[in-house]
């Protein structure tokens, strides 16, 4: 759930302000930047989402961008936001096609998780939904979509991740050997080797692989057009092969 909530927080909200407080629009802010199965994200909306990522990095990671570097930074984050939006739309289409439904209880649970994420940003969910130029109803729609995607990926991935006792034992042994080789006197070991930590490490690795494979499979079933970044019309542009 944490991954879906973080993605949701990154994709919506924020004011499209660039260095010096100047509003930055492209020449045609209403033109299509990205389209997935006919669902359109305009240049203006893409800039909003890119600025969200910049603002969050400034707030949470102390990102400092010199004013003269802002155009380059904005372009970097616009491209990242385009990728994130494509991933969201591809998985949303898959979730809708699968017939999975998000209930009011699902949304309530996700909202509680979002509240914890927002707390470190000194925001409540209501403040987050209402602030910025993006209409509140659009933000709430994005949130509901994130909940649906989370429920779909949990069903398709999390509940199907296999674990074996031998695999856990081997990973625990490997981590202990690494700790013995890399831990300096007086320092704590680099890797946790309790069963819970080892299980989580294996689970996360398998989840990441399965998530990526699911996305690449579903990408082939949608139509992606990206005038802003044409290379993102290919699955390898969004999710490069290993």
For the regions a protein language model found, what residue spans apply to each?
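N-terminal targeting/tethering segments
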Residues: 25-143, 166-170, 182-186
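Short, low-structural-confidence N-terminal segments
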Residues: 1-80, 186, 193-242
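Amphipathic alpha-helical coiled-coil segments
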Residues: 126, 155-156
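Ordered, soluble secondary-structure elements with a strong preference for glycine-centered loop motifs
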Residues: 101, 122, 162, 201, ...
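Small-residue hinge/turn detector
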Residues: 90, 148-149
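Acidic/polar surface patches and capping/hinge elements
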Residues: 131-140, 156-187, 203, 212-224
């Amino acid at each position: 759930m944490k991954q879906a909530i973080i993605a949701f927080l990154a994709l919506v909200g924020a004011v499209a302000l660039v260095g010096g407080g100047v509003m930055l629009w492209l020449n045609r802010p209403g033109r299509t930047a990205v389209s997935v199965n006919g669902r359109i994200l305009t240049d203006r909306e893409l800039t909003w989402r890119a600025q969200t990522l910049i603002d969050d990095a400034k707030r949470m990671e102390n990102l400092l961008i010199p004013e003269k570097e802002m155009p380059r930074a904005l372009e970097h984050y616009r491209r990242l936001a385009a990728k994130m939006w494509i991933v969201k739309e591809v998985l949303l289409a898959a979730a809708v096609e699968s017939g999975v439904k998000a209930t009011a209880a699902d949304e309530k649970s996700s909202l509680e998780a979002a509240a914890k994420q927002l707390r470190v940003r000194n925001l409540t969910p209501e403040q987050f939904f209402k602030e910025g130029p993006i209409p509140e109803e659009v933000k709430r729609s994005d949130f509901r979509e994130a909940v649906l995607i989370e429920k779909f990926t949990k069903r398709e991935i999390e509940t199907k991740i296999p674990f074996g006792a031998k695999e856990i034992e081997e990973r625990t042994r490997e981590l202990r050997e690494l700790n013995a080789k890399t831990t300096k006197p007086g320092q704590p070991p680099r890797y946790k080797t309790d069963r819970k930590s080892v299980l989580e490490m294996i689970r996360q690795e398998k989840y990441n692989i399965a998530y990526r494979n699911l996305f690449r499979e579903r990408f082939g079933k949608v139509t992606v057009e990206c005038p802003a970044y044409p290379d993102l019309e290919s699955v390898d542009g969004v999710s490069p092969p290993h």
